[in-house]
Amino acid sequence: MQADRSMKMGHVSNPLSTSAPVDATAGPNLIPDLITKIPWPRWILFIAILAAGVLLVSCLLCVICYCCHRQRHRKQPKDKETVGLGSARNSTTTHLVQPDVECLEPCSGGDQPWGQLLLSLEYDFGSQEIRVGLRQAKNLKAEGTADPYARVSVSTQAGRRHETKVHRGTLCPMFEETCCFLVPPAELPKATLKVQLLDFKRFSEHEPLGELQLPLGTVDLQHVLESWYQLGPPGSTESEQMGELCFSLRYVPSSGRLTVVILEARGLNPGLAEAYVKVQLILNQRKWKKNKTSSKKGTTNPYFNEAFVFLVPVSQLQSMDLVLAVWARGLQLLAEPVGKVLLGPRASGQPLQHWADMLAHARRPIAQWHHLRSPREVDRALALQPRLPLLRPRS
C-alpha cells in the first residue's frame, strides 16, 4: 500500500514537476502565440503597428512645436527689434517697393510732433534752376501707419509743383526723388520752398501729415546743402481751392478698349456755373481724340456718372497722355478750364500711380479722387506740338 501510495504520489508529483518548465518557456513565446491566434494577415498587423508609431511621433512633434511657439511668443514683447511692417509691405501695389526701415520708435520729447524731412538743395546759376532732392522722412505723425507722399512747390512759380510716388504702409518713407524749379537769382530772396507731406486716400480727402516752408533767402545756395528739417503743422493747399475730380479707368489689352468713367467733382468754386468735364487723348504730343460730359448747373459738387470708350492699341500706350479737364463758365460768357488732371507715362505722383494700377489690373475699373491742378501747369507739362495742316488736293 505504501508502494501504491508512493506510486500514486509520484504519479501525481510528475505532472507538477513537468509543468514548471512549461510555464517558464511560455513567456518568450507569448507574442508569437498571440499573433498566430489573431485571424488577420501579418502584413495588416505590421501596417497597424507602423501607423501607430507614426501617429505617436507626430503627436510628440506637435507638442514640442507648441511649447516652442509659446515660449517664443512670451519673449517677443520684450524685444523691440521684432516690431516691423511685414504685413504692410505685403500690401504694396504694382512697382512700389518700400525698403526696410527701422524707425518706428516714438519720437523723443515733445518738440517733434510732425516728424522730420531730409532735404538737399542745389542752385545752378547757369540754368537758374534750383534742384530739390527729397531723400526721406521719419517719425511722421499718423495713427498707425500711412501711405505718405510729398508735394513740392516754389512760391514764385504759381501752379508748378512736383509730387512723389506713394509709399505704402510706412511712417518713414524713402523718397529719393529730385525736382527742378526755375528761379532767377533776383527772385531767390523772396522765394519760399514749400514741401507738404500727405497721407494718400483713394476714395476720400488726402490727410495732411506735415509741412515745411523754407525761405530760400535764408539758405546759403553757394554749395550743395543737405540736412534734416523739422516739419510743422499742415496748412491749406492750392489744389484744395481748385476742387477735386473722381473718375475710374479700365483698360482691356486684347481689344484695346480704354474706358473712362467720370463720376463726380467736389469743392469747385461757387462762382462757377455749368460745369462739365472734357476727356482728351494726346498721342505723340498732339491732340488725338476727345469727348465731354453734359453740363451741370447750380452746384459745386456736380455728379456725372458718364462713361467714354476709346480704342487705344497697346503699342500706343507709351506715347499717349490722358487729360481730364473741368470746364465752367465764370464771369465771362465763354467757358474756361478750372483745373486739369494729367495721366499717362509723363505724369507724376497720384496720377502716375493711378495709371500704373490700371495697367497692373487689366479689365478691372480703378476709381480714385484727384486734386485738380492749374491748367497752365498741365499745359506746360504736355508741351503740345502744333497740329499739322491737312493737305487738300488741288482742284
Swiss-Prot record:
**Which biological process, per GO, is one annotated for this protein?**
vesicle-mediated transport
Signal peptide feature range: none
SUPFAM superfamilies the UniProt entry points to = C2 domain (Calcium/lipid-binding domain, CaLB)
Q: Name one GO molecular function term.
A: SNARE binding
Q: How does it sit in the membrane?
A: Single-pass type III membrane protein
Lineage top rank: taxon:
Eukaryota
What keywords does the record list, in alphabetical order? Cell membrane, Cytoplasmic vesicle, Membrane, Repeat, Signal-anchor, Transmembrane, Transmembrane helix
Compartments in which it is found: Cell membrane; Cytoplasmic vesicle, Secretory vesicle, Acrosome
Specify whether Repressor is a keyword of the entry: no
Tissues/organs with expression: Ubiquitous. Strongly expressed in heart, kidney, cerebral cortex, pancreas, and many insulin-secreting cells; lower expression in spleen. Broadly distributed in kidney.
Taken from the record's topology, the Cytoplasmic segments are 66-395
The UniProt record lists the C2 domain at 113-229, 241-370
Give the multimer and partner information: Homodimer or homooligomer. Homodimerization and homooligomerization do not depend on Ca(2+). Interacts with SYNCRIP isoform 2 C-terminus. Binds inositol 1,3,4,5-tetrakisphosphate (IP4). Binds to AP2 in a Ca(2+)-independent manner. Interacts with STX1A, STX1B and STX2; the interaction is Ca(2+)-dependent.
Family affiliation: Belongs to the synaptotagmin family.
PANTHER family under this entry? SYNAPTOTAGMIN (PTHR10024), SYNAPTOTAGMIN-8 (PTHR10024:SF249)
Q: Could you give the domain comment from the record?
A: The first C2 domain/C2A does not mediate Ca(2+)-dependent phospholipid binding. The second C2 domain/C2B is responsible for SYNCRIP and inositol 1,3,4,5-tetrakisphosphate (IP4)-binding.
- Described purpose of this protein according to its UniProt entry: Involved in the trafficking and exocytosis of secretory vesicles in non-neuronal tissues. Mediates Ca(2+)-regulation of exocytosis acrosomal reaction in sperm. May mediate Ca(2+)-regulation of exocytosis in insulin secreted cells.
Q: Which named protein is this? A: Synaptotagmin-8
